[in-house]
Curated annotation (Swiss-Prot):
This is Chaperonin GroEL. Forms a cylinder of 14 subunits composed of two heptameric rings stacked back-to-back. Interacts with the co-chaperonin GroES. Its EC number is 5.6.1.7. Together with its co-chaperonin GroES, plays an essential role in assisting protein folding. The GroEL-GroES system forms a nano-cage that allows encapsulation of the non-native substrate proteins and provides a physical environment optimized to promote and accelerate protein folding. GO terms for cellular component: cytoplasm. GO terms for biological process: protein refolding. Keywords: ATP-binding, Chaperone, Cytoplasm, Isomerase, Nucleotide-binding. It is found in: Cytoplasm. Pfam families: Cpn60_TCP1. It comes from Leifsonia xyli subsp. xyli (strain CTCB07). Its main location: cytoplasm.
């Protein structure tokens, strides 16, 4: 395909136009006075959202240079969303301000490389102050405040705080669509996986259609079990111990399954068989998780263990197991806490080293099942459009709240950036174009607060000047127009979100400023539409 090339100022200005179109669309959503953006979909109902990354993803521009500029800023929003779960609009506004100031200085003759170095040093200094000013999240109320700001709804904030309080910071909080109105919270006790009993005959509670065993043994086998001959030795030992048995295996069928069912119906021996969760290597890993949680061993010929040689000490144990037709829950496994902690640390290391979003999500689920728990927030609404928007808002707020628990919180509303900047620039000593680069950051970090003020119908310059003189942590509550202690008023942001937004915006701004040429695909001319046969003829 033929290419078109732009150089110097033309190249940079083309990219900036694309950035501005995208940023101007996204920034109307910032702050309590921000509005929504409607996104048309080719199929189904349109989406209404105030989430920066969702809006950015939908924007496609015709001009090839503008398109590249917009794509670069999409990357800022996406990276911030991936790392922190929120702050996408703030990151976009910061990127726009940094690029605007930076290009003005490049056009005036400043050295782009020195500007980039100055920007990087200033961002590092501001980030250090932000992290230093962060306060640990100590109460459920603080989590609720953070989530409420992200979701724009105190009820959602309270539910998320309740969920995180119950499952802990390693736990998983998922959001599902509900058929009812309102928002509900469902908590899972213990480890749960999505495989149920292999036969209805295993049910012990007919009313609830569940198999419930107290103080049960658990056989964990990474193989298919078809012959009862393999199972009999361990079944006899469990019967002698007067216990019940949960069998988790690749599959249980044929003679083995039939014999277990007959013994259950006759009241000789209570057991239940379920398929192992997952596939391939993930199944092996999950079986090992279950073994460590329950203090058992995975029975597999790979490690030299045969079913007929299994003894009771190789079985896992749990205070309670509950099995339905769709899922299995293991409550209070008898595993060694040190081994569980070691497994948790191993999975956490795998999460840090994984490049795949899907793998990270699955590892996070495994981690939660071992270390915390699982909470499901069920979101309902009157229409499909409202339901999608509400679900998305809750998902963002959950990630925001988890980021707050992870690294702490700072004053919200753009206040933390301005006040961290004030402290950082007093200590920073740079010269020449590096000092100019630092000054670009000094100007740009005011942009989020200015935009919040504009969206709330206030004068941005006056607001920023006033906040700069206030004590640390005090700023504008844009919802009421009052100047307050932001943390006491419950207006806070996770420091991870604010830090990531600034760092990612600065990274893209540096690329913009040091660009000397842009190579883009030449737009193809649309093919002429063929006339319909017989058009314009009388018959």
């Amino acid at each position: 395909m033929a290419k078109i090339i732009a150089f110097d100022e033309d190249a940079r200005r083309g990219l900036e136009r694309g950035l501005n179109i995208l940023a101007d669309t996204v920034k109307v959503t910032l702050g309590p006075g921000g509005c929504n953006v409607v996104l048309e979909k080719k199929w189904g109902a349109p989406t209404i959202t105030n989430d920066g990354v969702s809006i950015a993803k939908e924007i496609e521009l015709d001009d090839p240079y503008e398109k590249i500029g917009a794509e670069l800023v999409k990357e800022v929003a996406k990276k911030t969303d991936d790392v922190a779960g929120d702050g996408t609009t703030t990151a976009t506004v910061l990127a726009q301000a940094l690029v605007k100031e930076g290009l003005r200085n490049v056009a005036a003759g400043a050295d782009p490389i020195s500007l980039k170095r100055g920007i990087e040093k200033a961002v590092e200094a501001v980030t250090a102050e932000l992290v230093g000013n962060a306060k640990e999240v100590e109460s459920k109320a603080q989590i609720a405040a953070t989530a409420s700001i992200s979701a724009g709804d105190t009820t959602i904030g309270d539910i998320i705080a309740e969920a995180i309080d119950k499952v802990g910071k390693e736990g998983v909080v998922t959001v599902e669509e509900s058929n009812t109105f309102g928002t509900e919270l469902e908590l899972t006790e213990g480890m749960r996986f999505d495989k149920g009993f292999l036969s209805q005959y295993f049910v012990t509670d007919q009313d609830r259609q569940e198999a419930v065993f107290e103080d049960a043994y658990i056989l964990i086998a990474n193989q298919k079990i078809s012959s009862i001959k393999d199972l009999l030795p361990i079944v006899d030992k469990v019967i002698q111990a007067n216990k019940q048995l949960l069998i988790i295996a690749e599959d249980v069928d044929g003679e083995a399954l039939a014999t277990l069912i007959v013994n259950k119906i006759r009241g000789i021996f209570k057991s239940v068989a379920v398929k192992a969760p997952g596939f391939g290597d993930r199944r092996k890993a999950m079986l090992q998780d279950i073994a460590i949680l329950t203090g058992g061993q995975v029975i597999s010929e790979e490690v030299g263990l045969k079913l007929e040689n299994v003894t009771l000490d190789l079985l896992g144990k749990a205070r309670k197991v509950v099995i339905t037709k769709d899922e299995t829950t293991i409550v209070e496994g008898a595993g060694d806490p040190d081994q569980i902690a070691g497994r948790v640390a191993q999975i956490r290391g795998e999460i840090d080293n994984s490049d795949s979003d899907y793998d990270r999500e699955k590892l996070q689920e495994r981690l939660a099942k071992l270390a915390g728990g699982v909470a499901v927030i069920k979101a309902g609404a009157a229409t499909e459009v409202e339901l999608k928007e509400r679900k998305h808002r809750i998902e963002d707020a959950v990630r925001n709240a988890k980021a707050a628990v992870e690294e702490g919180i700072v004053a919200g509303g753009g206040v933390a950036l301005i006040q961290a900047g004030k402290l950082a620039f007093e200590k920073l000593s740079l010269e020449g174009d590096e000092a100019t680069g630092a000054n670009i950051v000094k100007v740009a970090i005011e942009a989020p607060m200015k935009q919040i003020a504009i969206n709330a119908g206030m004068e941005p310059g006056v607001v920023v000047a006033r906040v700069r003189e206030l004590p640390l942590g005090h700023g504008l509550n844009a919802a009421t127009g009052e100047y307050v202690d932001m943390l006491i008023a419950g207006i806070n942001d996770p420091v991870k979100v604010t830090r990531s937004a600034l760092q990612n915006a600065a990274s893209i701004a540096g690329l913009f400023l040091t660009t000397e040429a842009v190579v883009a695909d030449k737009p193809e001319k649309a093919a002429p539409v063929a006339a319909e046969p017989g058009a314009g003829m009388d018959f």
